[in-house]
Swiss-Prot record:
<comment type="subunit">
    <text>Interacts with SKI. Interacts (via LRR repeat) with CDC42BPA (via AGC-kinase C-terminal domain), CDC42BPB (via AGC-kinase C-terminal domain) and LIMK1 (via LIM zinc-binding domains). Forms a tripartite complex with CDC42BPA, CDC42BPB and LIMK1.</text>
</comment>
<dbReference type="GO" id="GO:0009986">
    <property type="term" value="C:cell surface"/>
</dbReference>
<dbReference type="GO" id="GO:0030512">
    <property type="term" value="P:negative regulation of transforming growth factor beta receptor signaling pathway"/>
</dbReference>
<feature type="modified residue" description="Phosphoserine">
    <location>
        <position position="28"/>
    </location>
</feature>
<dbReference type="InterPro" id="IPR039499">
    <property type="entry name" value="LURA1/LRA25"/>
</dbReference>
<keyword id="KW-0966">Cell projection</keyword>
<keyword id="KW-0675">Receptor</keyword>
<feature type="repeat" description="LRR">
    <location>
        <begin position="86"/>
        <end position="114"/>
    </location>
</feature>
<keyword id="KW-0433">Leucine-rich repeat</keyword>
<dbReference type="GO" id="GO:0060392">
    <property type="term" value="P:negative regulation of SMAD protein signal transduction"/>
</dbReference>
<feature type="region of interest" description="Disordered">
    <location>
        <begin position="54"/>
        <end position="82"/>
    </location>
</feature>
<dbReference type="GO" id="GO:0030335">
    <property type="term" value="P:positive regulation of cell migration"/>
</dbReference>
<dbReference type="GO" id="GO:0030010">
    <property type="term" value="P:establishment of cell polarity"/>
</dbReference>
<feature type="compositionally biased region" description="Pro residues">
    <location>
        <begin position="159"/>
        <end position="169"/>
    </location>
</feature>
<keyword id="KW-0597">Phosphoprotein</keyword>
<comment type="similarity">
    <text>Belongs to the FAM89 family.</text>
</comment>
<feature type="compositionally biased region" description="Low complexity">
    <location>
        <begin position="68"/>
        <end position="79"/>
    </location>
</feature>
């Protein structure tokens, strides 16, 4: 994405995720500064968007000496109009770039939150699977020897064992991140 090969990405080595290209230089520094926390990343993003909004407001305001010089030369043919058109085109381009950066940061925050949720869900499923495997191996009939020399009068050894415990349940966690994801994607967890 940043035009550099994956091996030469500065600052992106610690942030590279399996199967994803390295982050661009600007975003990798931002992610390193935040320690990888999407909440911190969102806070930094909101600060940056406020700064960009202030800069775009300042760019829209006429700057004193240049504006005055342009109005003094308004009598000449096409000379002053070109810089004004060029300045307005640059200002529009700058505004569009700021909007795209804000959209990129918003999407990055959403993707990072989604990535964290997927990782949490995978770990939860792995833990649940491990517990179920362990539970089934402890309570399966194959764990006892098939007829350990018992006569027909004796009870099988599993009759004296307590009944199987209820199936394991995973507690549902609902925090602000989960609620934010549900609202953002309208899915139920």
């Amino acid at each position: 994405m940043n035009g550099l090969p994956a091996t030469e990405a500065p600052g992106g080595a610690g942030c590279a995720l399996a199967g994803l290209p390295p982050l661009p230089r600007g975003l990798s520094g931002l992610l390193n500064a935040s320690g990888g926390s999407w909440r911190e990343l969102e806070r930094v993003y909101s600060q940056r968007s406020r700064i960009h909004d202030e800069l775009s407001r300042a760019a829209r305001a006429p700057d004193g000496p240049r504006h005055a010089a342009g109005s003094a030369n308004s009598g000449s043919a096409a000379g002053p109009r070109r810089p004004v058109n060029l300045d307005s085109a640059l200002a529009a381009l700058r505004k569009e770039m700021v909007g795209l950066r804000q959209l990129d940061m918003s999407l990055l925050c959403q993707l990072w939150g989604l990535y964290e949720s997927i990782q949490d869900y995978k770990h939860l499923c792995q833990d649940l699977s491990l517990c179920q495997d362990l539970s089934s191996s402890l309570h399966s009939d194959s764990s006892y020897p098939p007829d350990a020399g018992l006569s027909d009068d004796e009870e099988p050894p599993d009759a004296s064992l307590p009944p199987d415990p209820p199936p394991l349940t995973v507690p549902q966690t609902h925090n602000a991140r989960d609620q934010w994801l549900q609202d953002a994607f309208q899915i139920s967890l």
